[in-house]
């Protein structure tokens, strides 16, 4: 008899415990069909999956630099953006759209900065390729038409990187039917100025300081001569 009463007591505790957990989940918006939150928009920006190993860019970018750059700085921007997106209708949008929709909102400056920095970094990872590549076909024709030669374009990329005061980015962009080299400060991006980015070089100090200290020019030249992914740049040209 006592065993039966004990079992009834345990069942009763389990029932009330389950009921209490369910009430708390509903109250906090963490309970819903298929595990989905009913408390508002919910999404998580995921890190870009690199197509190469983090040591594959050595000796021009060390594994240690890349691990800090990708795992700390870039991941930090994503984490902060996800934190700021919590409960926002913007959380369901892709990263690029979040960046565009917050670019001119004074009350969303922090979200823009982190989303744009995450987007810029992902574009930078794609702009790099172990061993680099060579521009061909339509891209090479546009380079020659816009700059005269590939060497002239490379010099302009280096000049723009060195001319950027403080943190920022150097870009190869398409504006209308012409290629241009531009620079942007902090989290700014050519997409916000009606231009089509083709590739970029990160000139924030965290991108190179462990390897090159204050020698930004050496870092940029190493990328231009050995790591630029011209295939990626060509793929970003609008299809005619």
Model-derived segments and spans:
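N-terminal secretory signal peptides that target proteins for export/translocation
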Residues: 1-12
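Bacterial N-terminal signal peptides
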Residues: 17-32
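Mature extracytoplasmic/luminal segments of secretory-pathway proteins
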Residues: 6, 32-33
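Feature for soluble, non-membrane regions of globular proteins
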Residues: 36-240
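Hydrophobic alpha-helical segments, especially transmembrane helices
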Residues: 12-14, 123
């Amino acid at each position: 008899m006592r065993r039966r009463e004990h079992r009834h007591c345990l069942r009763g505790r389990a029932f009330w415990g389950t009921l209490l957990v369910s009430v708390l989940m509903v109250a906090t918006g963490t309970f819903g069909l298929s595990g989905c939150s009913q408390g508002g928009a919910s999404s998580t920006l995921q890190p870009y999956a690199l197509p190469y190993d983090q040591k594959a860019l050595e000796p021009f970018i060390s594994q240690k630099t890349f691990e800090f750059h990708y795992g700390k700085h870039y991941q930090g921007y994503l984490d902060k953006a996800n934190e700021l997106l919590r409960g926002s209708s913007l959380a369901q949008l892709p990263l690029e759209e979040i960046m565009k929709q917050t670019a001119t909102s004074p009350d969303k400056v922090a979200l823009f900065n982190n989303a744009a920095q995450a987007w810029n970094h992902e574009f930078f990872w794609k702009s790099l390729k172990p061993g680099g590549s060579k521009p061909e076909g339509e891209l090479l024709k546009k380079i020659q038409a816009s700059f005269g030669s590939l060497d002239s374009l490379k010099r302009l990329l280096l000049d723009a990187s060195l001319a950027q005061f403080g943190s920022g980015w150097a870009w190869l962009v398409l504006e209308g039917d012409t290629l241009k080299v531009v620079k942007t400060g902090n989290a700014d991006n050519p997409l916000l100025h009606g231009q089509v980015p083709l590739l970029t070089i990160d000139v924030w100090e965290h991108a190179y300081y462990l390897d090159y200290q204050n020698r930004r020019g050496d870092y940029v030249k190493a990328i231009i001569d050995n790591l630029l992914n011209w295939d990626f740049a060509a793929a970003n040209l609008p299809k005619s």
